[in-house]
């Protein structure tokens, strides 16, 4: 097989049979030169080179000189003679080389080797089946010299060969090496030299010296060859060399030609070689010229050809792909390829396929090998002609016969046997499994079978349907689950469906032998699930830990369910019953047509492309959604014009696709999906305004609707070749009906309108003219049997079901959202669909009525669906919604919304399982969690009155009314409602959040802020667009035809919608979105950033632009509803919340939002509803929203700004809401507490019902929701994937407060807040929050701890009681914005810091915001905040931006905006959420600087000054140390908590400033970051965090691992109310100091041991406590920073952030994760060892440590949740590897998602107590145990160790030592668990050390005042404290681990 590679290339493109030869011919001048050289070197023919005709099996490369020749040939480029170029009928024959040469201008030499194309030697070698060209005449032209002159290298001999065939002649340029290649090909494949009498050409080196001799020799050679050349020559490479095809046509591509055939063919294969053309490629195939549109440049990465149009040879893979994927039979059936985009015919492929050698022949020659393993299932079945894979059939038959043995499928076979079998199957042989070897190793057969499925490019259950499956199993009842699963299964591509049925029936039979095999269905499901059901997210690097486990759990639940219901699920009966019941025959299975095969084949090839692209782009949000959708062949379909469309198969004509705005490949994706996916959906939506409700609700009700973002279409296209293509329209509709369909619509840009389609066909009208029936059917399919009467069932199915469903405790619904991460777009699209029409037309033109209207109605509908069970009669239309899904659809669809404007409030009590795009989820999660819960309640109460306001809030809060009513309903999670809510407004840009909540006119400043938020929200917010404007809502509602009532109705509806939104979030978060929330988040961020950059007021501005007047009335009702706030604030609040959700959605939506949302939603809902809502019906929820996502907060801020006077009020409200700073925050605080305490992950869900109970207008619940969301997000999202994309999501999730802060600061509280008047905003933010804190001291831990921060000092004392909370809000001012978020932020502390812009916050809240931003977690969530940053950028807050940059983290320290630092601290707590993203932590750290900006900006150092009165430095806990040098570092340790390194910024964030560390001024998160408000509460009791009033500690002051900071623990005078942390009892402080000293000593002693020093802690801090990273400055005050252990800890701890000091949480860690410990520095290394020991001690004293950690976590409200999880994870799981684990940990309760949870509670309490006493009053209050632990931590830190202790604790160095897996910076929970042992180590010297309440210790002791609350700050500079990093960061930046 000479030139096997060449041939292979041609084989790949049989039609281009001669392609390879071209390359030879393409020899460029250089080749000629080479030839010359060769000839000169020797004229002797090498005898050994002459080979008699050999069997074809001999590959040319096998010959010694073959490679040389072939490569020479490959290098050569033919020179096409312009006049002579003829287009043979079979252009494909042309070799790549020749093509390249042709392309090359004249003699321009193109070296193939030069380009990306493979060398000829690497190309496929093939032979033509039939050759008929008569004879060929080859002669050397007479003007050979010219050739060499033409720029060919003089060394190489190049000859112009004239080839004549069939009366035509042309000239090819060939080098001497090319001649040798030709010779070899001819004699290896065609002639025996004895016959040809052609002697082998000598090596070039032997002849190159004598060019003339060479010429003569070649002339003789060609002469002889011409005599014998004839039809015998069927060798592709040889003919290609001559540039002729098997028919004698000249394979010629004009120089102008863009691509040659091979390249064309390649375009269809994985390698996709194409020449680049401006817009299209002209292929001349045979006599047919096909024009293929070139994909856009961004999509042409796979077009290897450079601008020179080099052509490459195709590797054998290409050949295989082409043959495998497009068998000849398929070729004939392939519909005329039509480029969807340009509609040009692409017949090239068909011709190509026809002309290529038969597959059989290629196989016979060994040229073609079909892949079996790793080949797309549809492709494989197509190629093999089997119903199900032969591997499966053979293995199952064998196993059923011989494999009924114990552990079948569980035990693994012998690898060698498995490989043997695999090879046999791959060789297309059916191995005899009955051989003894296999009989003896039966398990190898089972393993092989699993391996086959594991290696499928697209899993059996397909990536596209993953979310749907996970959503379906989260249904409330078995019946519903059955229907949903059935519905999703029906969406599988036929090959997958058949295979699944076969496999499931087999496994089901096998399960009947469980008594023998011990493999019952559960076990079988466990072993099979990962092979059958995978999500891209799970497979992403970011996905690990808890999230992964949760996903696995989901997978096994799905598989087990299918196994248990095989007969039902795969029976035609059920399908018909469901179809009849649902009234949508569309449920029918797509016809299992191989029909799709034609498209499949091409698609397959493309699919490979798409897959590759998807892998490349999938991280990219923009692209990924499409690619993801089109993961399968369909994806390529839309993407690459070359893809052949299947118009005939697809009911939807291409025109439909054209209709889709996206067009191009997006449209193609739609193609893949049922027609409803894109244009069809839109059309349907438009067409069926009335129908949509039912359909939509159905769709949403259907698990797949909710779960998958992709529309069924998309899925179809992906999975199968559009099973729907062949199917009747009904089928397609049915599929589209599924949420996947809806998602699909949203998925596509044009599908944005489709949101309706997805939700209900209400949107269809707007969406163009999709097939109405399809849309209708499609929805019902999802709902399938649900009827309006089923409303009650529906909501629980989704919301409750998910929550209740244990497997879905992941929160299937959130998972849906998550899964919709990419589908976020879906949500966005839905919103955009609704609003895309609007968003595109109106979103950007907020004023656009159209944009508003559809969404508004939609919103109403959404509400209806969400509240369907409880919907009031008022929702006249909604009442119609039969099933929850239907309701949901209604809610989502604008038309429906209109109808449902008055739809009775769907009570959240019946959870709606709506598949919200991740973004929407995020939006919801960020704000709905809080807002929805609150809103729900409010909505119920103010259904009419607050309708409007509710709507307004909805935008901000998802719906203010909804807050009210939703609060109650949202509690149940009204899971999908939030998403729907977005649609209601119709304004939901991409975020899908409806900002309609902002009814009030937005002032320019507000707009600016909003714009900033918009940036943050990105398009998402734009979608919300501040439909918030009442006018817009009004318009939307009015459009509904209820002008006056409409607003109310809309509001009411919206309220439910919001509720739904919240629910959706809460439900969805549990499972991380397989859709790659990160990607969605990134997309959202990118979009928001772009919008922010491009449009100062992109989305939000636009929304703001919307006339707000109409809204005002609604707002007023809201205001009325929340009497506490003036009407304006309420309005503002509602508006802001509306905006906020989009932001969140955008940011968090992808990954964390779902997760976060879930947790948050639940929690928020808990508190939000009544308590918070009343005063702040919408605002409180907004608070939650902030918690949910930075965007949320931003939204809030923007809305308030927009609402100038109201803004302030709203800001105050929003702060309460967003930060639980709002007026109603207090009540919510209690709820928050509840929520916090409740299992963070999704325990909120349970709370939700309670939440609804809170009819009061206290939206504080949002804070709770945030907690819960954070917890969930942490568990589900963070663990799922903390990718660059997720990172944003995480940021959102963890740092929602940050985002909120960002939002608020960004807002500037724009004119108002920025004006420096925080009175309403800032004060309300802080004071209100404080007040709220006071009010809801117990209830809303998150709020409480936030609120204390909110009020600089005024409520400090009062809050001290609520120290747990207050410490958390140590960033009172800055944090207040963020406070509510903080609990939510717990998971994503990094986010807030990142996003906070000092400028924005500066006025009054910036510090808080910045503080949050400072958080390392924030940096971890840098992306999210980056968006904010972008928005803030509009605010032109340099600080903000810096906080964005991961590397800048350090600079935060030097930034003078200390106030923001405080905020950062708040964020830090949320940062703890970050631990899962710890891997991103480095970035996070880098991003700390952004925190820095915010941290430093606004807050004066006054707080810091308060801190300065540290106790004497004699104590390590010289908390009040202001600037001082320690170990050469200046530590400004003012500190109640800060001790040396800690620094309270005016924003009342703690900043651990490590003078030595790089400006690692990181705000230690107060407790907010902690997912658990309860943590915060418990930890904060003692004011763990500085109070807001405390001046921010200068970074220098903050001492992460500063020598000083460690040595001098920050000690705020206990009397210092602001530094809540300081509220330690003196006794505690003393104890703490003593312990700290002792600890430090021990730690130092141990430093040499396991590298578990505080610095060790630092490392863990990095990992576990991104948010708590500040704790990372593990060096205790006393520790001069020599304790390298600290840094080591950080390193060991998973290097979350290098030596990240508490204060440095954001800024400091940007540097090296470990060694970077600014304060850790070198000392870290030695400390590390101590730290390790310390950690061990820590683990040993795990109870102390854990308790402390828990405590700290709570106290680190923001980071708290993240840290505890990390800690536990550290213990139970490697905390570094598992961001999710961390998340889980972050969830106060689900810290470790293990026993540690319990520990966490307990520890939380203990820690809390300690922290209350030390860091937070509450902490100390809680119990001595924890106090003792805290004291220990302090001890570790020596007197100043409390902070340092925190840091270590956060890092859990001890844990690290014990369990490297416990690297989470926040080892709080994990570490505590693990730390049980480690802690002892660390605590060895601490053992007896009873941490004095850190708070108290702050003054005398170290930052314990601060650290104690962290509970994790335990790490002492000695390296003993392991908790330090995680907890400190979490608890309060101020705590900045001043570990010694």
Curated annotation (Swiss-Prot):
GO biological process: small GTPase-mediated signal transduction
Domain characteristics, as noted in the entry: The N-terminal PX domain interacts specifically with phosphatidylinositides.
Domain SH3: 262-324
PX domain mapped to chain residues: 154-248
Disulphide bond pairs: none
Marked site (Arginine finger) residue numbers: 410
Skewed-composition ranges (Basic and acidic residues): 1691-1707, 1736-1755
Alphabetized CDD domains for the sequence: PX_RICS, RhoGAP_CdGAP, SH3_ARHGAP32_33
Entry-linked InterPro entries: PX-Rho_GAP, PX_ARHGAP32, PX_dom_sf, Rho_GTPase_activation_prot, RhoGAP_dom, SH3-like_dom_sf, SH3_domain
PROSITE patterns given in the database record: RHOGAP (PS50238), SH3 (PS50002)
Occurrences of domain Rho-GAP (ranges): 375-570
One GO CC term on file: plasma membrane
Keywords noted in UniProt: Cell membrane, Cytoplasm, GTPase activation, Membrane, SH3 domain
Pfam families: RhoGAP (PF00620), SH3_2 (PF07653)
Region (Disordered): 646-746, 1035-1163, 1219-1264, 1430-1454, 1675-1786
Keyword Nucleotide-binding (UniProt): no
Biased composition (Polar residues): 1047-1061, 1725-1734
Ranges annotated as biased composition (Low complexity): 1081-1094, 1145-1163
One Gene Ontology term of the molecular function aspect: phosphatidylinositol phosphate binding
Protein location: Cytoplasm; Membrane; Cell membrane
Protein name, UniProt field: Rho GTPase-activating protein 32
Top-rank taxon, per record: Eukaryota
Location (main, coarse): cytoplasm
Role according to the record: GTPase-activating protein (GAP) promoting GTP hydrolysis on RHOA, CDC42 and RAC1 small GTPases.
């Amino acid at each position: 097989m000479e030139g096997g590679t060449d041939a292979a290339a041609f084989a790949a493109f049989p039609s281009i049979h001669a392609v390879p030869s071209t390359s030879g011919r393409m020899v460029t001048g250089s080749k000629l030169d080479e030839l010359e050289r060769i000839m000169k070197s020797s004229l002797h023919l090498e005898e050994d080179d002459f080979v008699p005709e050999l069997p074809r099996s001999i590959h040319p490369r096998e010959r010694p000189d073959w490679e040389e020749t072939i490569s020479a040939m490959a290098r050569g480029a033919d020179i096409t003679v312009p006049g002579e170029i003829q287009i043979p009928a079979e252009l494909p024959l042309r070799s790549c080389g020749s093509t390249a040469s042709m392309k090359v201008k004249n003699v321009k030499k193109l070296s193939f080797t030069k380009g990306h194309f493979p060398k000829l030697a690497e190309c496929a070698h093939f032979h033509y089946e039939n050759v008929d060209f008569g004879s060929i005449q080859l002669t050397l032209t007479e003007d050979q010299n010219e050739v060499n002159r033409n720029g060919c290298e003089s060394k190489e001999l190049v000859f112009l060969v004239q080839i004549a065939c069939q009366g035509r002649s042309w000239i090819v340029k060939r080098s001497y090496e090319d001649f040798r290649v030709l010779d070899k090909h001819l004699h290896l494949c065609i002639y025996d030299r004895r016959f040809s009498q052609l002697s082998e050409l000598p090596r070039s080196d032997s002849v190159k010296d004598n060019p003339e001799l060479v010429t003569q020799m070649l002339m003789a050679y060609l002469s002889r060859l011409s005599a014998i050349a004839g039809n015998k020559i069927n060798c592709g490479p040889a003919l290609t060399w001559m540039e002729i095809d098997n028919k004698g046509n000249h394979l010629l591509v004009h120089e102008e030609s863009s691509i040659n055939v091979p390249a064309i063919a390649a375009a269809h294969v994985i390698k996709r070689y194409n020449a680049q053309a401006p817009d299209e490629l002209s292929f001349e195939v045979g006599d047919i010229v096909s024009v293929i549109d070139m994909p856009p440049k961004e999509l042409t990465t796979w077009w290897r050809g450079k601008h020179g149009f080099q052509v490459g040879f195709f590797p054998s893979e290409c050949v295989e792909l082409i043959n495998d994927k497009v068998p000849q039979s398929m070729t004939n059936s392939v519909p005329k390829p039509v480029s969807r985009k340009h509609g040009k015919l692409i017949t090239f492929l068909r011709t190509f396929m026809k002309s290529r050698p038969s597959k059989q022949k290629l196989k016979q020659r060994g040229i073609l090998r079909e892949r079996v393993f790793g080949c797309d299932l549809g492709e494989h079945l197509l190629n093999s002609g089997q119903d199900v894979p032969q591997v499966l059939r053979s293995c199952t038959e064998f196993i059923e016969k011989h494999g009924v043995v114990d552990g079948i499928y569980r035990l693994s076979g012998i690898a060698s046997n498995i490989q043997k079998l695999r090879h046999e199957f791959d060789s297309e042989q059916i191995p005899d499994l009955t051989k003894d070897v296999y009989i003896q190793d039966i398990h190898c057969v089972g393993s092989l079978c699993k391996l086959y499925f594991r290696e499928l490019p697209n899993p059996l259950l397909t990536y596209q349907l993953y979310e749907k499956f996970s959503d379906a199993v989260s249904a409330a009842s078995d019946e519903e689950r059955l229907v949903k699963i059935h519905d999703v299964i029906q969406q599988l591509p036929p090959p997958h469906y058949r295979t699944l049925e076969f496999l499931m029936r087999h496994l089901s039979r096998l399960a009947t032998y469980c008594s023998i095999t011990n493999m019952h269905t559960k076990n079988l499901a466990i072993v099979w699930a990962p092979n059958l059901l995978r999500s891209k997210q799970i497979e992403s690097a970011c996905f690990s830990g808890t999230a992964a486990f949760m996903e696995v759990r989901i997978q096994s639940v799905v598989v087990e369910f299918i196994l248990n219901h095989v007969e039902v699920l795969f029976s035609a009966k059920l399908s018909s019953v469901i179809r009849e019941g649902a009234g949508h025959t569309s449920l029918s299975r797509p016809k299992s047509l191989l029909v799709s095969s034609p498209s499949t084949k091409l698609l397959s090839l493309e699919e490979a492309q798409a897959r590759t692209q998807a892998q490349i782009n999938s991280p990219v949000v923009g692209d990924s959604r499409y690619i993801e959708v089109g993961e399968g062949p369909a994806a390529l379909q839309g993407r690459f014009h070359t893809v052949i469309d299947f118009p005939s198969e697809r009911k939807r004509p291409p025109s439909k696709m054209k209709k889709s705005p996206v067009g191009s490949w997006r449209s193609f994706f739609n193609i893949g999906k049922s027609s409803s996916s894109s244009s069809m959906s839109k059309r349907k939506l438009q067409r069926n305004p009335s129908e949509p409700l039912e359909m939509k609700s159905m769709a949403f009700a259907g698990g797949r609707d909710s779960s998958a973002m992709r529309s069924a279409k998309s899925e179809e296209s992906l999975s199968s070749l559009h099973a729907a293509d062949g199917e009747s329209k009904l089928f397609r509709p049915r599929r589209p009906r599924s949420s996947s369909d809806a998602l699909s619509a949203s998925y596509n840009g044009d599908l944005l309108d489709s949101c309706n389609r997805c939700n209900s066909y209400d949107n269809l009208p707007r969406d163009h003219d999709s097939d109405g029936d399809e849309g209708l059917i499609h929805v019902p399919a999802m709902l399938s049997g649900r009827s309006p009467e089923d409303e009650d069932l529906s909501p629980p199915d989704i919301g409750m079901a998910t929550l209740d469903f244990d497997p879905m405790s992941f929160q299937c619904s959130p998972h849906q959202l998550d899964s919709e991460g990419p589908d976020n777009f879906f949500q966005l699209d839905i919103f955009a669909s609704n609003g895309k029409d609007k968003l595109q037309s109106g979103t950007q033109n907020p004023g656009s009525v159209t944009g508003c209207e559809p969404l508004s109605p939609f919103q109403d509908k959404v509400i209806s669906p969400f509240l369907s069970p409880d919907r009031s009669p008022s929702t006249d239309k909604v009442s119609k919604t039969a099933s929850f899904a239907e309701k949901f659809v209604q809610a989502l669809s604008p038309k429906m919304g209109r109808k449902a404007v008055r739809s009775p409030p769907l009570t959240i009590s019946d959870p709606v399982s709506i598949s919200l795009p991740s973004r929407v989820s995020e939006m919801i999660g960020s704000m709905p969690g809080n807002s929805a819960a609150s809103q729900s309640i409010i909505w119920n109460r103010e259904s009419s009155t607050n309708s409007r306001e509710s709507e307004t809030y909805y935008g901000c809060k998802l719906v203010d009314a909804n807050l009210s009513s939703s609060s109650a309903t949202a509690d149940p999670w009204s899971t999908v409602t939030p998403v729907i809510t977005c649609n209601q407004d119709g304004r939901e840009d991409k975020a899908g959040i409806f900002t309609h909540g902002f009814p009030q006119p937005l002032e320019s400043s507000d707009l600016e802020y909003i714009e900033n938020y918009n940036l943050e929200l990105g398009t998402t917010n734009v979608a919300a667009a501040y439909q918030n404007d009442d006018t817009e809502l009004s318009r939307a509602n009015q459009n509904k035809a209820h002008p006056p009532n409409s607003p109310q109705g809309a509001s009411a509806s919206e309220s439910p919608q919001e509720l739904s939104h919240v629910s959706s979030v809460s439900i969805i978060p549990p499972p991380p979105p397989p859709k790659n929330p990160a990607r969605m988040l990134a997309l959202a961020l990118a979009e928001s950033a772009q919008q922010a950059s491009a449009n100062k007021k992109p989305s939000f501005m636009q929304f703001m632009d919307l006339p707000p007047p109409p809204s005002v009335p609604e707002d007023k009702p809201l205001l009325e509803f929340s009497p506490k706030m003036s009407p304006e604030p309420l309005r503002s609040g509602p508006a802001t919340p509306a905006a906020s959700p989009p932001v969140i959605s955008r940011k968090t939506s992808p990954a964390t939002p779902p997760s976060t949302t879930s947790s948050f939603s639940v929690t928020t809902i808990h508190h939000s509803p009544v308590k918070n809502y009343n005063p702040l019906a919408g605002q409180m929820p907004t608070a939650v929203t902030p918690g949910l996502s930075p965007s949320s907060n931003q939204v809030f801020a923007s809305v308030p700004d927009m609402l100038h006077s109201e803004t302030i009020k709203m800001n105050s409200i929003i702060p309460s809401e967003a930060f639980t700073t709002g007026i109603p925050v207090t009540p919510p605080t209690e709820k928050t507490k509840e929520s916090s305490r409740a299992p963070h992950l999704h325990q909120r869900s349970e709370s939700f019902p309670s939440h609804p109970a809170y009819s009061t207008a206290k939206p504080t619940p949002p804070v709770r929701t945030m907690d819960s969301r954070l917890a969930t997000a942490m568990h589900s999202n963070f663990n799922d994937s903390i990718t660059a994309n997720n990172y944003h999501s995480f940021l959102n999730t963890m740092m929602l407060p940050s985002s909120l802060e960002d939002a608020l600061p960004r807002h500037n509280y724009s004119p108002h807040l920025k004006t420096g008047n925080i009175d309403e905003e800032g004060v309300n933010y802080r004071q209100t929050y404080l007040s709220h804190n006071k009010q809801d001291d117990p209830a809303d831990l998150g709020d409480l701890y936030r609120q204390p921060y909110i009020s600089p000092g005024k409520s400090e004392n009062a809050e001290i009681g609520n120290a747990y909370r207050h410490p958390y809000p140590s960033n009172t001012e800055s944090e207040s914005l963020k406070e509510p978020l903080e609990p939510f932020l717990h998971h994503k502390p990094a986010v807030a810091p990142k996003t906070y812009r000092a400028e924005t916050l500066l006025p009054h809240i910036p510090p808080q915001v910045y503080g949050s931003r400072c958080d390392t977690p924030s940096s971890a969530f840098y992306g999210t905040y980056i968006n904010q940053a972008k928005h803030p950028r509009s605010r032109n807050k340099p600080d903000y931006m810096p906080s964005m940059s991961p590397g800048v983290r350090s600079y935060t320290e030097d930034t003078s905006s200390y106030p923001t630092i405080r905020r950062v601290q708040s964020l830090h707590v949320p940062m703890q959420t970050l631990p899962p993203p710890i891997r991103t932590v480095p970035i996070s750290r880098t991003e700390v600087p952004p925190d820095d900006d915010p941290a430093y900006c606004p807050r004066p150092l006054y707080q810091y000054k308060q801190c300065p009165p540290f106790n004497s430095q004699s104590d390590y806990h010289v908390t009040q140390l202001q600037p001082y040098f320690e170990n050469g570092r200046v530590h400004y340790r003012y500190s109640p908590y800060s001790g040396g390194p800690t620094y309270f910024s005016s924003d009342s964030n703690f900043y651990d400033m490590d003078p030595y560390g790089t400006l690692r001024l990181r705000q230690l998160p107060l407790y907010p970051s902690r997912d658990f408000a309860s943590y915060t509460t418990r930890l904060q009791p003692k004011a763990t965090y500085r109070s807001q009033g405390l001046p921010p500690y200068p970074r220098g002051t903050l001492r992460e691992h500063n020598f000083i900071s460690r040595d001098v623990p920050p000690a705020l005078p206990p009397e210092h109310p602001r530094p809540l942390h300081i509220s330690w009892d003196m006794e505690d402080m003393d104890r703490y100091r003593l312990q700290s000293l002792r600890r430090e000593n021990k730690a130092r002693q141990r430093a040499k041991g396991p590298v578990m020093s505080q610095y060790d802690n630092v490392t863990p801090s990095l990992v576990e406590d991104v948010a708590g990273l500040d704790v990372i400055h593990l060096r205790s005050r006393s520790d001069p920073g020599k304790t390298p252990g600290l840094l080591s800890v950080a390193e060991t701890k998973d290097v979350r952030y290098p030596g990240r000091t508490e204060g440095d949480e954001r800024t400091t860690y940007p540097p090296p994760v470990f060694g970077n410990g600014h304060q850790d520095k070198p000392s870290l290394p030695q400390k590390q060892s101590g730290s390790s020991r310390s950690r061990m001690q820590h683990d040993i004293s795990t109870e102390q440590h854990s308790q402390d950690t828990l405590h700290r976590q709570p106290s680190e409200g923001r980071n708290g949740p993240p840290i505890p999880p990390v800690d536990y994870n550290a213990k139970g799981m490697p905390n570094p590897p598992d961001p999710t684990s961390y998340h889980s940990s972050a969830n106060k309760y689900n810290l470790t998602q293990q026993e540690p949870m319990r520990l966490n509670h307990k520890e939380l309490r203990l820690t809390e107590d300690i922290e209350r006493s030390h860091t937070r009053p509450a902490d100390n209050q809680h119990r001595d145990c924890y106090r003792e632990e805290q004291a220990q931590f302090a001890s570790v830190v020596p007197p100043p160790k409390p902070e340092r202790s925190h840091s270590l604790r956060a890092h859990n160095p001890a844990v690290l030592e014990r369990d490297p897996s416990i690297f989470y910076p926040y080892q709080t929970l994990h570490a505590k668990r693990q730390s049980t042992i480690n802690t002892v180590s660390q605590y060895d010297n601490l053992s007896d050390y009873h941490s004095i309440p850190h708070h108290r210790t702050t003054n005398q002791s170290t930052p314990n005042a601060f650290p104690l609350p962290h509970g994790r700050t335990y790490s002492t500079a000695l390296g003993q404290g392991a908790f330090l990093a995680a907890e400190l960061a979490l608890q309060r930046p101020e705590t900045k681990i001043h570990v010694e």
